[in-house]
Amino acid sequence: MSEPSFRSVVEMFQHRVASTPDAEAMSGKRDGQWHAMTWRQTERRVRAGAGGLLSLGLQKGERAAILATSRPEWVIADLGILAAGGATSTIYTSNTAEESAYILVNSDARVCFVENAMQDAKLREVRDQLGHVVQLILIDGEPAVDDGWTISLTELERRGDAWNTANPGRLDEVIAAVGPTDLATLIYTSGTTGKPKGVMLTHDNWLFEAETIADLGILGPTDKQLLFLPLAHSFGKVLEVAFIRLGVITAIDGNIDDLVANLAVVRPTIMAGVPRVYEKVYNRVVTGAREGGGLKYRIFQWALDVGGRVSRLRQTGGQPAGLLAFQHRLADKLVYSKLKARLGGRLRFLVSGGAPLSRAIAEFFHACDVLILEAYGLTESSAGSVGNRPERYKFGTVGIPYKGVETRIAEDGEILLRGRGIMRGYYNLPEDTAEALEADGWFHTGDIGHLDADGFLSITDRKKDILVTAGGKNIAPQNIEGQLKAACPYVSQVVMLGDRRPFCVALITLNEETAGKWAREHGIEYKDYADLATRPALQHLIRDGIEAVNATLASYEKIKDFHLLDHDLSQETGELTPKMSVKRKVVEANHKEILERFYGETVARI
């Protein structure tokens, strides 16, 4: 592994500060403007926050939670907790009061950082359940209620500076006492069923991830990333430890609605996202080209054809020459450059994780001269375990295992992982831990996949999501759902169902932006999303997409019928997890009446 090695995430952070104290560390938005801070400035606030937590009586190993969107203060709070010898529990701002209380109680959190007055008020709704939480720390503004339970982050840091002055050298002793096997993070997997489980991740887990990314040799201090993923999730957290380890300048804003505007200002060289983000970009570009019609659309199709030929050449290690090179330069000027400009104009590559990326979408971006590297991991493996590299990639796969990660395919096709990134276990759940984690270190991912002759891993589906038809045929729905989303840019979500049933159907939601634009341009008036979903012309448009995908499938895999839902799936309806994964069982239960119309009494018997 890369040198130097560290005993804790905080020690790694201290090394970064000592190496490049006055270099830009990260930036965030305040009043609509970006404000940057150096590593030295970041350290001052981390030490103040850590001192403040120690003044509150936080003991080694105790949990402090963060209930906030991704922003520089999230990183400062996290590092402050770790420097005080504690461990961070993460909560999404989209969690309800009851869900937040569950995590705070289950993780035994003593302190909770809250983003704003709204999150403060949310926890006050369930204060009677939170007797063990001694302090809320408000990141934005001053407390609305002057009862001492909530103090501002500014006040915490003021107290911390005073505590550090009164106890010289004590904070450094606390930091030095933190070791690699100590708990660093409790991340609660929302899952698609049941209560969330606290995944215990140690300092060594995160150090392994940081070292692994450093070993790839693809990032450095000249890079700039735009981090919009939730830092409450392992994918976001691994980006945090990577930018600390490598000195990558990081602009942080968790507001996904500002992503396009932020790209234009930040102009990142690298960015990581979930497939949903890339699907939305794809939908906008493709529908815009189609609606341009005539010559514009023909030029777009020609450019994609040229880009596709160059992509296939590059995938085998070649480069365009002669006429193809000239055509590619022209296509870049006419088409690709516009997409790249939307993404800031400086991207070297994108990273995709958290859910399967449609091969068609990866190939589309590459045809437009934008490389998306798909990677794979789980919260239980500290996120990054397998990935494609800029110099070695295959679309439709998640790449090859990172150094220090072992992979094995079980007899039933389940992917097993082993290595330093694997969790310690589930917090206070020994039986669940024993079920997922073998005594010799192999972790059962719950994903089905296979390794090809070159060692590239392909994910077929979640083990629990595999559909087994009434005729005994196995179907991997995520692959088919991804094909449909790529074939029909007017679709937002596809939920394919058919387990133990005679045929497959799909519950589909519209991409209101692209579908609404198409409707208006075709003279179709509608009141709202629900009204739009009832329009026959839209139904025919979606059916055409389904028929195009069905033409590539075996008979038992085909979608025989579909229904356009009157709403998009969301966390608010309980149909999506915070990382935007579909909760199939919830969707199925919420729309049982629709399924009964498809299957008659079949549903009632299941």
Say what each PLM segment does.
Residues E43-A48, P180, V199-G220, S337:
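Conserved structural elements of the adenylate-forming
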Residues P401-T469:
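Conserved ATP-binding/catalytic segment of the ANL
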